[in-house]
A protein has these predicted regions:
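Short Pro-Gly-centered beta-turn/loop motif in secreted/extracellular proteins
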Residues: 90-106, 499-508
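Aromatic-lined carbohydrate-recognition surfaces of secreted/lumenal glycan-active proteins
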Residues: 79, 277-284, 309-343, 404-409, ...
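Beta-strand-rich domain onsets/edges
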Residues: 19-88, 110, 123-130, 151, ...
Length: 526
């Protein structure tokens, strides 16, 4: 109860502060020529067309009775990752952070939960579902070097999922399968699953030394360095040995690797069932599909992935395993940054062979502060101009699936008041353009807090400063989600019904009955 009161107080404090007024002067005339009145009118018209619906509801009230319709929740999901759960250094910061996530009244009604295999199962057979002492708020509040900890930005899943369930927040799991060796594949996989005799035979035949892992290797940069060496080693092996030769040399590893991937999905499915509403079943695999000449060969022994050796046709298998172990109610996402032809051909190939793809995930990261500064003067990346955003999602819509804009970064050029306003305006215009896309179903901001991203990501791309003070972009986003895009209307009853048009979501209808008492009805605009 005490924790709940702290979170409610934190949310109330941020709501009381929330006010956003655009300062157009921080952007050049050239910028406003790009985001001109005509472009804005087109966005407004598409938002009205695609994000709203007409609702008609029966009520027990005489004709002419005034009825207030107040939107409570969105059908569209506005999300962010929740990787810094309890890690921000003080109870007050953590409470503010947690208060951002919830079904009603919060900024984010959806949260992306980390299931990166490398940190989720740092040691074989020991998945980090439950919290240990090193995951506690007390640990992080006294930790002098949080970014150097192996579990920084990787909280155990149970406490995060339990919290989000208590808040009625939608939960998105990221990811189940991803070939990336730096962030996903456990260091121990090769050494644990491949017998020494097979390792020696492979190294002798190829002349390539495959890096070894042991538990004494520090997490963080040393571990990531080892992963890159492992990836380079496999590229050399591919160049020297045929697929058949490799398969003959390491058959035990190939079999065990498949079993290990399947076991991971089975364990997660058994643990969470329907608690998690959607999954990035496979992440960033289109490059491999292109590498294999855009044709999935289902009888190959393994995939000679650009990431390193992967299970044969791993993207296809990931969807089959997900279908086997996860509930039918969960949405299955194919997520990628690569929106080339290969992505759409891969989606077509997967579904043609029986994979269930419910949603396609697309990413957009504006990491470079200089690019944000250039955008403000009317230059910068063309893909963030309104007409190019529209063109991109006409292309993504070719997959004929709902779209989840799954990872969004828009950095500030700097954290001065002007820099924060530039970030807020870029974010506001892009969010409006994305929200107007017909097939868009949700948008997920990536790093909520400054200086809390992965190595190489900008330190000023958050909606909050490192000490959880709201930046201008927070107020701009809250203004969109909780004001501009929430419907409040007063209508009159007619023939035992009320009708109105509003953003899709849940509503509370209130009116005074004949006895003067307030009557309430909860409805959904679909």
């Amino acid at each position: 109860m005490k924790t709940k009161l702290v979170i409610v107080a934190a949310l109330a404090a941020m709501t009381a502060q929330a006010e956003f007024k655009i300062d157009r002067s921080v952007m050049s005339e050239e910028y406003w020529k790009i985001w001109n009145d005509g472009a804005q009118a087109k966005i407004d018209a598409d938002i009205e067309k695609y994000r709203k619906a007409d609702g008609a509801f029966e009520i027990d009230a005489p004709d002419g009775t005034e009825v207030k319709a107040e939107q409570l929740t969105h059908a569209f999901f506005f999300g962010a990752h929740i990787f810094n759960f309890d890690q921000l250094g003080t109870k007050e910061r953590n409470a503010r952070y947690k208060a951002l996530y919830g079904k009603e009244g919060a900024l984010f009604n959806s949260a992306t939960v980390a299931f990166y295999w490398r940190t989720f199962e740092r040691f074989p057979g020991k998945p980090r579902f439950e919290a240990g002492a090193e995951d506690s708020e007390a640990f992080w509040n006294t930790c002098p070097n949080p970014k150097e900890q192996p579990h920084w930005r990787r909280p155990p899943s149970d406490p995060v999922v339990d919290y989000l369930v208590s808040r009625g927040c939608r939960i998105h799991g990221h990811p189940l399968v991803w070939g990336n060796n730096t962030w996903m594949t456990p260091n121990w996989l090769w050494d644990e699953l491949c017998p020494e005799a097979e390792k020696a035979a492979l190294e002798k035949a190829s002349g390539v030394k495959v890096p070894r892992w042991n538990a004494s290797i520090p997490a963080g940069a040393p571990s990531r360095k080892l992963s890159k060496e492992w990836q380079r080693a496999w590229k050399k092996i591919y160049a020297k040995l045929s697929e058949k030769q490799i398969a003959a040399l390491v058959p035990t590893f190939i079999k065990a690797q498949n079993e290990c991937y399947e076991r991971r999905i089975r364990q997660i499915g058994a643990r969470y069932g329907a608690k998690i509403h959607s999954w990035d079943v496979v992440n960033e695999s289109a490059t491999d599909f292109d590498l294999f000449k855009r044709k999935a060969v289902r009888n190959r022994p393994f995939d000679a992935s650009h990431y390193g050796l992967m299970p044969a046709d791993y993207a296809y298998k990931a969807f089959l395993w997900a279908g086997k172990y996860l509930p039918q109610t969960a949405w299955f996402n194919l997520n990628d940054y690569n929106m080339g032809d290969g992505f759409f051909l891969q989606a077509k190939d997967l579904t043609a062979h029986g994979a269930r793809i419910d949603v396609v995930g697309s990413q957009m990261h504006l990491f470079n502060p200089k690019e944000s500064a250039n955008i403000a003067i009317g230059k910068g990346p063309e893909h963030l101009r309104p007409e190019k955003i529209a063109e991109r999602f006409v292309r993504v819509s070719k997959a004929n699936r709902p779209i989840h804009l799954s990872e969004i970064t828009i950095t500030a050029p700097d954290n001065s008041p002007k820099g924060q306003m530039i970030q807020a305006i870029i974010m506001r215009n892009c969010y409006r353009a994305w929200f107007s896309v017909e097939k868009m179903t949700g948008i997920t901001w990536w790093n909520v807090v400054d200086a809390c991203g992965a190595p190489g990501e900008p330190s000023i791309s958050g909606l909050f400063t490192r000490d959880m003070q709201p930046k201008t972009a927070y107020f701009a986003m809250d203004d969109l989600v909780n004001r501009e895009w929430k419907t409040k209307a007063t209508v009159k009853a007619q023939g035992g019904k009320v009708s109105f048009r509003g953003f899709r979501g849940s509503y509370r209808l209130t009116w005074k009955g004949a006895d003067g008492k307030v009557q309430t009805k909860f409805v959904n605009v679909k």
